[in-house]
């Protein structure tokens, strides 16, 4: 695929994180909070830590000239006491493809989708699946703010710490895609309609209900991993032609 991967030691992130002072990020934190619809569980101290982490990662992006990255999120939480959700949100808004939990397949999918469509994407878990109605709910604790109509500053769902982003997304046509397989030679591709932003207490912060145009049983039967990638708009034909032309097998 022509993509070069490189491992970056988390110790380098910690080093830069510890060099950045609270005063250096205070203005940026206030500016972001002022744009939010609301700030809920998270404290000002949580916001400062999360912004320091963003600045540390951004420094590495610039030094290494990265086009995309994925974080070892839970190790970061253990070492810094904050989450990478805000950093990933801001990086995606800046055109740096940024994904969660060390998921290289999903970040590759996001990168390919951005190159082909010019659109940023939402990386999420299928957190509720109704095969009878062909509806799914996709949820995650981060999304690029530019993809939202409004956003709420929350904490991270699983750990109840740090910063999470609850995005309120526009309704309408969406495309869901995932590249997988050992050689990135398989893919799932489906379209649907985003009908609702939900607010369940037992899911990650950004939640969207999607009425799928194809059977939702795929997500229960044998999905290509957990994370899937959502784009606003219908790009099924474009993505299918690209992946088929590169010898990939479509999984239904």
Please describe what each predicted stretch is.
Residues 23-44, 114-136, 193-196, 225-248:
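A broadly tuned preference for mixed-charge, low-complexity surface segments
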Residues 164-252:
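Extended hydrophobic packing segments that form well-structured cores
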Residues 95-199:
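C-terminal catalytic subdomain
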Residues 10, 72-74, 126-127, 140-142, ...:
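Fold-independent oxyanion-binding glycine-rich loops
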Residues 1-117:
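Conserved, well-structured core segments that form the ligand-binding/active-site neighborhood
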Residues 8, 72, 119-126, 252:
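Flexible, glycine/charged-enriched surface loops at secondary-structure junctions
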Residues 1, 24-28, 87-91, 141-145, ...:
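Short, low-complexity, polar/charged sequence segments that are solvent-exposed and flexible
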Residues 63-66, 121-122, 248-252:
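Intrinsically disordered or highly flexible coil/loop and linker segments, enriched in small
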């Amino acid at each position: 695929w022509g993509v070069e991967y490189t491992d970056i030691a988390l110790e380098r992130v910690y080093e830069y994180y510890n060099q950045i002072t609270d005063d250096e990020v205070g203005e940026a934190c206030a500016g972001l909070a002022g744009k939010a619809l609301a700030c809920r569980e998270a404290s000002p101290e949580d916001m400062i830590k999360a912004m320091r982490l963003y600045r540390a990662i951004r420094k590495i992006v610039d030094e290494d000239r990265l086009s995309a990255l994925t974080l070892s999120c839970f190790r970061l939480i253990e070492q810094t006491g904050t989450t990478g959700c805000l950093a990933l949100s801001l990086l995606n808004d800046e055109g740096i493809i940024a994904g969660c939990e060390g998921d290289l397949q999903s970040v590759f999918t996001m990168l390919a989708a951005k190159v082909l469509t010019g659109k940023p994407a939402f990386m999420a878990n299928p957190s509720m699946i109704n095969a009878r109605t062909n509806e799914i709910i996709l949820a995650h604790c981060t999304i690029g703010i530019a993809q939202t109509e409004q956003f709420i500053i929350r904490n991270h769902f699983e750990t109840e710490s740090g910063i999470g982003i609850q995005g309120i997304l526009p309704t309408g046509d969406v495309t869901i895609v995932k590249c997988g397989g050992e050689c990135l030679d398989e893919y799932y591709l489906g379209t649907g309609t985003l009908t609702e932003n939900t607010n369940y207490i037992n899911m990650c912060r950004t939640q969207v209900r999607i009425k799928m145009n194809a059977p939702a049983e795929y997500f229960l039967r044998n999905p290509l991993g957990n994370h899937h990638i959502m784009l606003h708009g219908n790009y099924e034909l474009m993505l299918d032609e690209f992946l088929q032309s590169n010898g990939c097998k479509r999984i239904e």
